[in-house]
UniProtKB/Swiss-Prot annotation:
It is found in: Cell membrane. Its main location: membrane. One of its GO terms (molecular function) is C4-dicarboxylate transmembrane transporter activity. It comes from Haemophilus influenzae (strain ATCC 51907 / DSM 11121 / KW20 / Rd). GO terms for cellular component: plasma membrane. InterPro entries: C4_dicarb_anaerob_car, C4_dicarb_anaerob_car-like. Belongs to the DcuC/DcuD transporter (TC 2.A.61) family. Keywords: Cell membrane, Membrane, Transmembrane, Transmembrane helix, Transport. This is Putative uncharacterized transporter HI_0585. The chain crosses the membrane at residues 29-49, 77-97, 105-125, 147-167, 186-206, 240-260. The keyword Signal does not apply.
């Protein structure tokens, strides 16, 4: 959720007039606390369910005994820095650090920072510019298509709701019953993420329909919009049909439901934290 390339950050940035970096820095404390709540609860449940111990280690080693294990020796620091270059540029350019003499050039957008990172990658890896250009635009195209597909679907859904008058009725209700906003903005996307296994569509639909009216409802665009986005991501984490849950369950060779038994309690507490303290 704190990635400069997040579609949610870009959407809220456009609504609020802030840069993407400023949007991410605004919600970062709540994001990290929600993550910490989930991690602590997951650790406690691991102890309760006894998901640790020598028997688990021996079982894993027995399964991997016949597998070929490649040991990676040494780390190329220049390679490791490549993904961080755009992020560091955006963080410096989006904060007061850009006013330091010599750092004024860091004030730029996400595409420019990504291009600088790509050029750095070409230099340190000494790979063919043709190959890295193909991979760069291939990755950019796939990401753009996936994000744009969700945004179009959410926009069509919201347009349908607006045509029926449902959005206007909901906004009017929320203006008169302001206390329901915090729960609708968090529990709604959370439940949709839980049910569908994808929190992005629900959060984008909410942010398209409701977040533009955030000031009328007594909230900032950043807090209301990013609370919905984070809640949707939390709901996805607690969903047994989410892609990441299915993959992790396959790696652990357990049922996705067993995974959710351990992730859902922490996610529920995290979304309650967002509702009570972020909004």
């Amino acid at each position: 959720m704190m990635s400069p390339g997040s579609s949610h950050s870009a959407m809220i940035s456009e609504m609020s007039g802030l840069t993407i970096t400023q949007v991410n820095l605004s919600h970062a404390p709540y994001n990290m606390i929600a993550g910490a709540i989930g991690a602590v609860v997951l650790t406690i449940l691991a102890l309760v369910f006894k998901d640790y111990g020598e028997q688990h280690r021996q079982a894993y080693l027995a399964e991997q005994k016949e597998s070929e294990i490649k040991v990676i020796e040494g780390v190329n620091v220049l390679y490791a820095l490549a993904p961080l270059i755009p992020l560091v540029i955006l963080v410096i350019g989006g904060t007061s650090l850009q006013q330091v003499p010599g750092l004024e050039w860091t004030k730029m957008g996400v595409p420019q920072a990504m291009l600088i990172g790509a050029i750095y990658g070409i230099i340190v890896t000494r790979i063919s510019p043709v190959k890295i250009t193909e991979e760069f635009f291939n990755g950019m195209g796939n990401s753009y298509a996936n994000v744009l597909g969700i945004i179009i679907a959410a926009s069509v859904f919201v347009a349908g709701l607006k045509s029926t008058g449902a959005v206007d009725a909901a906004i009017s209700f929320l203006k008169e019953s302001n206390e329901f906003v915090r729960w609708g903005a968090t529990i709604g996307p959370f439940l949709m993420g839980l049910i569908t296994g994808s929190g992005d569509a629900a959060a984008i639909a909410f942010n398209t329909a409701v977040t533009p009216h955030a000031v009328e409802l007594g909230y900032t665009h950043v807090n209301l919009g990013m609370a919905a986005a984070i809640a949707g991501a939390i709901g996805r984490t607690a969903s047994p049909i989410a892609g990441v849950t299915i993959v992790c369950a396959g790696l652990a060779m357990v049922s996705p439901v067993e995974m959710v038994k351990r992730t859902a309690p922490g996610m529920i507490l995290a979304v309650l934290f967002l509702a009570l303290f972020m909004l």
